Amino acid sequence: VPDGLRLRRAHPQDLDDIMWLEHVSFPADAWSASQMSGELYSPHGYYVVVETVDESAAPSVVGYAGLSSLAGNPVADVQTIAVAAEQRGKGLGRVLFTELLDEARRRGVREVFLEVRADNPVAQSMYTAFGFEHIATRPRYYQPDGVDAWVMRAELPVAADATPSSSPSPSTVGPIGQEALDERG
């Protein structure tokens, strides 16, 4: 993971940056700003961003991801994940996805579901590496281009300190660097 990046909890003030990345990442089927805003404000959601950290410039969001789970429910859904094109191939998708799964464990989630485009083998491969299995296909799910969605599922071991009513993680997750990855095991 390159130096100069930080992983942190997303805030509603990140909406414009997230929406810019949403539209360039998913031009045919991007979420609306009101949908994304609803996710950022939802008490059931957990969204994180990867941003640049440079003392000479304002931070810039280069990746984001979101999870949704109702309090006390052992099931969660990965809502979205995106990394800026110029940052792909550096492991940021894995960092974002790992944080979502860690939060799911902290919430006592036992099963995680997601949908991924059938024409996105890179994402499918990453999810498979995390133990997700293709369990169903939703024909023509992604509109307007009519691409099928793979529904994928994984079971999670629950973290020792997780309780279904555990509070969300602190707003600052921390820097991304080899040290942070080493700490995650």
Per-range role (PLM):
Residues P2-L5, R9-L15, M19-E86, R94-R107, ...:
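Acetyl-CoA-dependent GNAT
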Residues D17, S125-M126:
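Well-formed, non-transmembrane alpha-helical positions, independent of function
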Residues V83-E86, K90, A118-N120:
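Active-site acidic-Proline motif in GNAT/NAT acetyltransferases
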Residues F97, N120-A123, R140-D145:
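Short glycine/proline-centered loop/turn elements that form peptide/ligand docking sites
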Residues F113-E115, T128, E133-W150:
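Conserved catalytic-core motifs of GNAT/GCN5-like acyltransferases
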Residues K90, R138-Y141, E155-P157:
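Acyl-donor (CoA/ACP) binding surface of acyl/acetyltransferases
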Residues G91, G108, G131:
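Short glycine-rich hinge loops at helix-strand junctions in the catalytic core
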